[in-house]
Structures are given as structure tokens and as C-alpha cells.
UniProtKB/Swiss-Prot annotation:
Changing residue 262 to A: 3-fold reduction in catalytic efficiency for both substrates. NAD(+) binds at residues 132-135, 155-158, 205, 232-235, 255. Changing residue 71 to A: 3200-fold decrease in the affinity for quinate. 170-fold decrease in the affinity for shikimate. Belongs to the shikimate dehydrogenase family. The gene is ydiB. It comes from the Bacteria. Induction: Induced under carbon limitation but not under phosphate limitation. This is Quinate/shikimate dehydrogenase. HAMAP family: Shikimate_DH_AroE, Shikimate_DH_YdiB. Changing residue 107 to A: Loss of activity towards quinate. 20000-fold decrease in the affinity for shikimate. Its EC number is 1.1.1.282.
């Protein structure tokens, strides 16, 4: 790719960032489509995020992806949020239109799209959702919008627990889905929730390097063949949770599905063009 002065810059702001496959994926897509953009990753944490947004405006960047730990903070630095992003309380995409910043969340639509593409119908189903960060709440919100009957959210009593309660209230007030929040330390409640669940989704960092040998499911017998187990983590590709799920006879969806579909939507938001999906799946080794 020959980058010229006509090229516009798209960023990714996160910390840590070295593990991300998004720059490779987006740049391959941009090159295939012949579009005058280049995508670069920047190590940005909560402390440096405000300055990074000022830099985005000053450099007239087309926009940026936003990942951990900035997804919730980023809502405070855009001029407009989509209705879904307001429901989530977090964004992963910013589009810059001449200094006017719009915030979107494609994590939820991407993950739910990956589930649907597998042939699974979420309408009327119950999801056990692990975590209350930006990815988890995005998945929960989109699932509620698209027809989940119930979401049983489990999170440790950390700084995200109150945010989880607020998220549940927003979803309960604005959709037909019923969301409950329970301390993950309550293993009896966790076991009971899994027994009646249709979907288990991990939206936490547990399973991601350097936590690749960990899983929030301590007892594999809690998993049953009728359960669909989905993962947000894609590095490593086969997390411990997915290994447990396959051993238990569950159908699984790895983190590549969410990465692909959320990235496809981002691509269109930034460029106005269709994402070369089949090409990217092939060159990135994401499979069918």
C-alpha cells in the first residue's frame, strides 16, 4: 500500500494494544477496497484519552476505534450518541465529521450478528452474561433490543458492579427484556442460572493473555449440551472456557466472530463502503 498525503487516518485507542488484530484486519480491508485511509493503533489509557481526542480533532482524523479501558469514558467526549450506545453506556467507535464526533457501539451488533450467522435464534432465549464492561453491556443491550427474554448478568463486586445495576435498570425500562445482576461470588446462583440458560457469553478479559489458563466456570459439569457458549476474547483463539464448553458438548462461537462483524460495521461507518467480508475472513484465517 502506497500511502500518500491524500490518505485519511483512522485510529484505535486502547491500553494495552499490542494484542489487537484490528489494525491488520482493517488495513487489509481498506487496501482491498482501494480506499484512501490507513488505520493505526495508539496506546491510550483513561488518563491520556482526553488529550488523544483533542489530537484526533486537530489532526482531522476520520475517526477511531475505542477499546479497553476507554469505552465508557469515551461517551463523555463525543457530541452525539446513538440510542443503542446510550443504552449501553459505552462506545467502541467514534466518527469525526468536521469536528463533530458521533459515538457508536458495534460490539453488541457484531456479537449478536455472529450468533445469528451460526444459525441460532436469540428471540425468547435466556443469556447468562459474564462481566459488566463495555463489551458485555453492548452485547446485553443489543440482545435485549433483538429479542432476548432474559439476561442474567454476573459480575464481581468491583467498580463495575454499580454500573451493571444502572445498565440493568436502563434495559429494563426501555426494552421487554428482564435483566438481573448477581455477584459472581454467589456460585449457587451462577449454577442455577446456567442450568436454565440458552446462551453463556464471556464479556470479560478472563481467558485473554496473560489469563489464558483461567475461566470463570470453575466446574465443567455446570455446562450442558443445550448451551451455546460464546466468547469475546480472541487471543488466544481457543480460550479455556471454549475448551471446557467443547468438552461438555456445547456449541461454541469464538471471539473471531465478534471481531469480524463489529469491524465490518465500523468500516462502513468510517468509509461509507461495504466491508470485503469474505476476503478478510480468508486472509485473516477466520474460517467460514
Amino acid at each position: 500500500m502506497d500511502v500518500t498525503a491524500k490518505y485519511e487516518l483512522i485510529g484505535l485507542m486502547a491500553y494495552p494494544i499490542r494484542h489487537s488484530l484490528s489494525p491488520e484486519m482493517q488495513n487489509k480491508a481498506l487496501e482491498k477496497a482501494g480506499l484512501p485511509f490507513t488505520y493505526m493503533a495508539f496506546e491510550v489509557d483513561n488518563d491520556s484519552f482526553p488529550g488523544a481526542i483533542e489530537g484526533l480533532k486537530a489532526l482531522k482524523m476520520r475517526g477511531t476505534g475505542v477499546s479497553m479501558p476507554n469505552k465508557q469514558l469515551a461517551c463523555e467526549y463525543v457530541d452525539e450518541l446513538t440510542p443503542a450506545a446510550k443504552l449501553v453506556g459505552a462506545i467502541n467507535t467514534i466518527v469525526n465529521d468536521d469536528g463533530y464526533l458521533r459515538g457508536y457501539n458495534t460490539d453488541g451488533t457484531g456479537h449478536i450478528r455472529a450468533i445469528k450467522e451460526s444459525g441460532f435464534d436469540i428471540k425468547g432465549k435466556t443469556m447468562v452474561l459474564l462481566g459488566a464492561g463495555g463489551a458485555s453491556t453492548a452485547i446485553g443491550a443489543q440482545g435485549a433490543i433483538e429479542g432476548l427474554k432474559e439476561i442474567k448478568l454476573f459480575n464481581r463486586r468491583d467498580e463495575f458492579f454499580d454500573k451493571a445495576l444502572a445498565f440493568a435498570q436502563r434495559v429494563n425500562e426501555n426494552t421487554d427484556c428482564v435483566v438481573t445482576v448477581t455477584d459472581l461470588a454467589d456460585q449457587q446462583a451462577f449454577a442455577e442460572a446456567l442450568a436454565s440458560a440458552d446462551i453463556l457469553t464471556n464479556g470479560t478479559k478472563v481467558g485473554m493473555k496473560p489469563l489464558e489458563n483461567e475461566s470463570l466456570v470453575n466446574d465443567i459439569s455446570l455446562l450442558h449440551p443445550g448451551l451455546l457458549v460464546t466468547e469475546c476474547v480472541y487471543n488466544p483463539h481457543m480460550t479455556k472456557l471454549l475448551q471446557q464448553a467443547q468438552q461438555a458438548g456445547c456449541k461454541t462461537i469464538d471471539g473471531y466472530g465478534m471481531l469480524l462483524w463489529q469491524g465490518a460495521e465500523q468500516f462502513t461507518l468510517w468509509t461509507g463502503k461495504d466491508f470485503p467480508l469474505e476476503y478478510v475472513k480468508q486472509v485473516m484465517g477466520f474460517g467460514a
